[in-house]
């Protein structure tokens, strides 16, 4: 097993394999991610999968063995594309059948040298290349998109904002939803009153201990009501820490 590569100049390097390279950087070229990209805090390149197809028609897909609807991305073509950029970075396949993307996985990727991201299309990718290249299958939710490009953008946006120097306030990232195991507490800003609704008095009291307590209580309430799965995991972790 080879050692994972170190970050080149400290930069996270993303290589996206796609049939639609024109979709990148897309939203990753603006706001936090775009500024960080322009400043060289991370690197993005795309690989056109069709460049690795052979024959006059440069076919990247074929009919599914055993019959069925749609087309399947060819193992040989995809493998050549992957091999062209393989340097030990994790290889990810964006697919609805993958493991759900979590903030924990996002943090792990942000701490690494980068990722090679394969964007699926059609009915999917030949299983043999998934096994042969040890692709990690990742899903961003229980719904179907036209392709993996949008999912790759979501993943990269989540990763890039955690890279050093990208977010101005480190605390902002550490207190967001999922970072603490809870959904985030409510936020307010001026004016003090809007359409008869006032900012909770506790937030303007200047008592930071009381404010922290209120925010935790609100985060716990929202998580308990909206994400019982997260609430159960949070409670389990608290019991573990408490030695109960």
UniProtKB/Swiss-Prot annotation:
Keywords: Cytoplasm, Methyltransferase, S-adenosyl-L-methionine, Transferase, tRNA processing. S-adenosyl-L-methionine binds at residues 120, 140-145. One of its GO terms (molecular function) is tRNA (guanine(37)-N1)-methyltransferase activity. It catalyses: guanosine(37) in tRNA + S-adenosyl-L-methionine = N(1)-methylguanosine(37) in tRNA + S-adenosyl-L-homocysteine + H(+). GO terms for cellular component: cytosol. Coiled coil: none annotated. Specifically methylates guanosine-37 in various tRNAs. Homodimer. This is tRNA (guanine-N(1)-)-methyltransferase. It comes from Brucella abortus (strain 2308). The gene is trmD.
């Amino acid at each position: 097993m080879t050692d994972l590569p170190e970050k080149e100049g400290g930069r996270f390097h993303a290589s996206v394999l796609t049939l639609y390279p024109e979709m990148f950087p897309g939203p990753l070229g603006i706001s936090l991610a775009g500024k960080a990209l322009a400043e060289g805090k991370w690197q993005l390149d795309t690989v056109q999968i069709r460049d690795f197809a052979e024959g006059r028609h440069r076919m990247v897909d074929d009919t599914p063995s055993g019959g069925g609807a749609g087309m399947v991305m060819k193992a040989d073509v995809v493998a050549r594309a992957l091999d062209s950029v393989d340097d030990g970075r994790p290889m990810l396949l964006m697919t609805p059948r993958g493991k759900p993307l979590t903030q924990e996985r996002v943090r792990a990727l942000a701490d690494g040298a980068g990722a090679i991201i394969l964007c699926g299309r059609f009915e999917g990718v030949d299983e043999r290349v998934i096994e042969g290249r040890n692709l990690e299958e990742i899903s961003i939710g229980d719904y179907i998109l036209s392709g993996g490009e949008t999912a790759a953008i979501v993943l990269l946006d989540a990763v890039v904002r955690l890279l050093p120097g990208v977010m101005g306030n480190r605390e902002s990232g550490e207190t967001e939803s999922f970072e603490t195991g809870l959904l985030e507490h409510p936020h307010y800003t001026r004016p003090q009153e809007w359409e008869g609704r006032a900012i909770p008095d506790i937030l303007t009291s200047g008592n930071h201990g009381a404010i922290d307590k209120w925010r935790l209580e609100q985060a716990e309430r929202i998580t308990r009501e909206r994400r019982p799965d997260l609430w159960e995991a949070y409670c389990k972790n608290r019991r573990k820490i408490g030695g109960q």
